[in-house]
Amino acid sequence: MGHVNLPASKRGNPRQWRLLDIVTAAFFGIVLLFFILLFTPLGDSMAASGRQTLLLSTASDPRQRQRLVTLVEAGQHLQPIEYCPAEAVAHMPCEDPRRNSQLSREMNFYRERHCPLPEETPLCLIPPPSGYKIPVPWPESLHKIWHANMPYNKIADRKGHQGWMKREGEYFTFPGGGTMFPGGAGQYIEKLAQYIPLNGGTLRTALDMGCGVASFGGTLLSQGILALSFAPRDSHKSQIQFALERGVPAFVAMLGTRRLPFPAYSFDLMHCSRCLIPFTAYNATYFIEVDRLLRPGGYLVISGPPVQWPKQDKEWADLQAVARALCYELIAVDGNTVIWKKPVGDSCLPSQNEFGLELCDESVPPSDAWYFKLKRCVTRPSSVKGEHALGTISKWPERLTKVPSRAIVMKNGLDVFEADARRWARRVAYYRDSLNLKLKSPTVRNVMDMNAFFGGFAATLASDPVWVMNVIPARKPLTLDVIYDRGLIGVYHDWCEPFSTYPRTYDFIHVSGIESLIKRQDSSKSRCSLVDLMVEMDRILRPEGKVVIRDSPEVLDKVARMAHAVRWSSSIHEKEPESHGREKILIATKSLWKLPSNSH
C-alpha cells in the first residue's frame, strides 16, 4: 500500500493539540481545586494544617516568632493571632507535665512552677473546649457547673462516693463533701466551730492546703471567712480549675522547695484536710513554712493522716513534737483532726530540740517569697514590723478600712494609704456610673487586680458578690502584707511569666499601669513583650469577660492595636474628672470563639 507524505507543517499539528489539551486540563484542574478548597472541609483542614505549621515554626524559630511579635505590637498583623491546638484547652505554661516530668523529684521540685522562655512558646490563643458555655452565674455556680466546660470525669468517678462532685446530665454538681468530711463541709465546719471562733469577724483570711474542689473554702464564705485554696496540678486533673469554675478563690501551687508566694503572717487560719503534706520531713521544713504564713494567735487545723492514723504512730508523734517545739497550744484532738493555736510574741523555741530548729537571723527577709528557697529556720516575730497578731488587729469588717500598722511603718504610709482609699472609691464609682461596668452582675465573680498596691480597688468591691485576686508584682514594693492585714487575699507574681492558674478562670481583669509591669526598674526598656502579656491575659480571661486598663494615651493606643490580634473588642474612654494626670481607660471584651470542627 502506498504512503502519503504530508508537509512538515501538517505533521506538527497533532503535537500542538496535545500541548493545548494539557494546558486546558491544568487550568480546569486548578479551578476545580480552588472550589474544593473554598467550599469543602478539605480546604479548611489544609488551611488549619498550614496555620498550625506556621504556629509551630514560631516556637522552633525564635526569629520568626519575634517578627510576628513586632508586627502585632505595631498593629501591622491584620489577622488575629492563631489558635493553639485543641489539646491545649487546659494548658498552663509553667505547670506543663510533659516539660516538668524531666525534672528532679526531690521535695516535689518537678511539681513547682517551671516556666519556658517566651521564645520557646508558640504565640497562640488557648481555645475553649468543644461545647463550652458561659459559666453558671454565682451563687448557683457554687453547687453546679457545666460539664462541657471541663469534661473531666476522673474526680467524679473516683471521689463521688465521698461527696466531692457528681455528674448529673449537663452538669457537675457539688454536694459539699470531701475525703475527711463525706457528710459535707458544713458538718465538718460545725465541729471546728466548737474550738475555733469562726463567727464574729476574729478570723478573716484562711489558706486551704491541698484543697480538692474547694468545698471547705466555699462553705467558709458564708461565715465571712475568705479562704484561698491551693493545690498542684495533679493526677485528679484540674482540682483548682473546678474550684475557680465554682467561683471559689483558688490558685495552683505546690509546697516543694520554695516558699509559697505570700508574705509572713498572712493567714488567720491554715487548714489541711488529707492534704498529705509531710510537715515533719526535711527537719520540719514544711511546718516551718506554715509557721511563717500563720499569723500569731492564728489556728492550724490538720485532718487526716497522720493524726491518730493507723500505722502512722511515729509520724503523728513527730508532728506533735514539732508543734511543742514551736510552743503551739494544743486546742483539741477530735478523732483524726488536730487543732493548734500559734503563740503570740517572741518564739519560745528552745536552743535544743530534736529537729534542730533555730530562729532565722535578721538577714533572712520574712516576707520575700518569689522564687525564694525554703529556709530551715523559724521566722522571728520581731522581724515583722507592725502589729499583726490576732487580737491586736481589728476584726472584720473594720480591718478593711482601718490603716494597717504594716502600712504605717512605710514612708508616708498613713497618708499614702488614705489617699489610695479615696482614689479607688472615686474611680470605681466612675466605672459603675459613667462607664456602665456591671461589677455587681451575677456574671462577674472571679476578679483580678494585676497591680494591686494596697488593695484599694478590691476594697471598694468588698460588699459586692465578687472576690478579688490581688497581685503584687514581685519587682515592685512588696505591699501584699498590707492587703492581708485588710482581710483581702493575693499573691506575688512577675508578669513576664505566665500566672499559675488554668485557662478561662477570671471574669474581670483590672490593671493600672500595664506597661510598668514589664519595664526594667533602671531604664525605659521592657523586660518582655506586651504582646505576650496580653496573650497571657487572654488565656486566663473567660469568654465574654472584660479587661479594664488604665495607662497613658500612648500606651493605650498601642494596647488597642494589639487587642484586635487577641480577638478583643475595645474602646478608650476619658478618666474620671477628679483624677489628675494624662491617663485614660481602655475597656475590652473577649469574644467567645470556637475552634473549627476540623481542628479537633
UniProtKB/Swiss-Prot annotation:
One of its GO terms (molecular function) is S-adenosylmethionine-dependent methyltransferase activity. Pfam families: Methyltransf_29. Its EC number is 2.1.1.-. It is a single-pass type II membrane protein. The keyword Cytoplasm does not apply. Keywords: Glycoprotein, Golgi apparatus, Membrane, Methyltransferase, Signal-anchor, Transferase, Transmembrane, Transmembrane helix. It is found in: Golgi apparatus membrane. The keyword Isomerase does not apply. The chain crosses the membrane at residues 19-39. Pathway: Glycan metabolism; pectin biosynthesis. Residues 1-18 are cytoplasmic. It is an enzyme of class 2 (transferase). One of its GO terms (cellular component) is trans-Golgi network. GO terms for biological process: cell wall biogenesis; cell wall pectin metabolic process; methylation; pectin biosynthetic process. Glycans are attached at N283. Highly expressed and abundant in suspension-cultured cells, but low levels in seedlings. Residues 40-600 are lumenal. InterPro entries: Put_SAM_MeTrfase, SAM-dependent_MTases_sf. PANTHER family: PECTIN METHYLTRANSFERASE QUA3-RELATED (PTHR10108:SF763), SAM-DEPENDENT METHYLTRANSFERASE (PTHR10108). Belongs to the methyltransferase superfamily. S-adenosyl-L-methionine (SAM)-dependent methyltransferase (MTase) which mediates the methylesterification of the pectin homogalacturonan (HG) and thus regulates cell wall biosynthesis, at least in suspension-cultured cells. This is Probable pectin methyltransferase QUA3. It comes from Arabidopsis thaliana.
